[in-house]
Amino acid sequence: MKKLGFIALCVAFLASSCNSSAPTPFPEVSEPIAITQGPKDHLFASYYGINSWSKDNRYVAVLETDITDRLSEDGEYATLALVDLQDNNKLIPIAKTCTWNFQEAAMCHWLPWAEDTLLFNDKREGKFVTVILNWKTGEEKIIPYPVSAVSKDGEWAVSINYARLRISRPDYGYAGDGQDAQRDVAWPDNDGLWLVNLKSGEAKLILTVASLKDQMTQMEDPKGMAYFCHTVFNPSATKIFFLARTVENLDAQTKKVSKWKTTSFTCDVDGSNVRRCFPDGWGGSHFNWKDDETLAVTAKWEDRVYGHTIFTVGEEEKVQHIGAGILDFDGHCLFSPNGKFMSSDGYYKKKVFERPWVLVRLEDQAIISLGAFYVPEVYRNTYSRCDLHPRFRTDGKQIGFNSVHEGSRQVYLRNIEWK
């Protein structure tokens, strides 16, 4: 890690936000503390922005793997484990899973309505499923749909087709035929977003890929594929944000699938009221809800430059381009629990190989650096890369991230003191 300290990179006051009152002070953020160690690699057990701490903040959910620089194949397991923060970071293995990747791990979530209980994706009896596990008793419940997002109350999930995703975006899909990928169907009318009741196990197809064909980028390649990915509920679980993509020339791309075209959408939780977030050419990449109506999304502003945007659902034409140029990169944006700050980490540039990380004060768009983290050559492969993928603890007193700056893929925490 490059120790940049808390150097103000930019202070950009919008005319509408200037006033005589003092802005909210930036918090003090500690240096990173490793809570896992080699020789094996470790990462948070879920995608960025997802809470990894138990209700009492004692345990942190992680994955452990022997694989370093390639995608996992069908039948190659990672260990789901808990780090005990009150017992010298003791690692407690609790399960195995063969549906995982280095980006979203196994999409593990703690369930707030059940004590000592987590869910994660796995392959059981040849099918991709969700496993609900009480890690202390070992009791399991199987939901026959893998999760892509879970509501804040833990009662609902969105499910997508991870077998199709393995073909169209390998670093986010799962190996094996645990779902019907429908490889020869460009616009499936029987697949898309599934709303899953995590208590009953019942699911309903709320939005099909085919239903959005006229609003997505069209394909000339007869072997192209359209698909949905990257879903997230708003805090009250009344709306869903998701990305819809088309991808062509799959057979010619033996090393990297990169020619996808993205359209960002929101819809109500029943699949109605579908809204495009941006005009043609803007795409969309990373995202998070600030509240029930406000989203941050990294997108290609005015089809010119990738940057961070904020907008209100229903008022998409009033979208703001924030950061005065400093935030013109594709970052993993997430909001602090108090809603006053936004964290975002980006990708390294050629010949530099350091991942930047910044904290934005939303009231005046002042920005400070949280450091720059070196990426060794072994972790520069697209499919096995190590993004920082931060996430706040629910009380805002810690932020965690994955990193390879000390030579191997490990999990780190930073303490936060709010002023």
Question: Model-flagged regions — what are they?
Answer:
Residues I33-A78:
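Beta-strand-rich domains and repeat architectures in extracellular enzymes and scaffolds
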Residues Y47-G49, I67, E73-K123:
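Blade-loop segments of beta-propeller domains
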Residues I50-V60, W100-L118, D122-K123, S148-W156, ...:
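Blade-terminus and WD-like Trp-Asp/Gly-His loop motifs, strongest in beta-propeller folds
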Residues V305-Y306, G323-I368:
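Loop/turn-rich, solvent-exposed surfaces of beta-rich toroidal or solenoidal domains
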Residues I33-L43, P93-F102, G201-G224, I368-T382:
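Surface-exposed loop and turn segments in beta-propeller and other repeat-based domains
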Residues T99-G192, I206-P222:
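Asp-box/WD-like beta-propeller blade repeats and closely related beta-sheet repeat scaffolds
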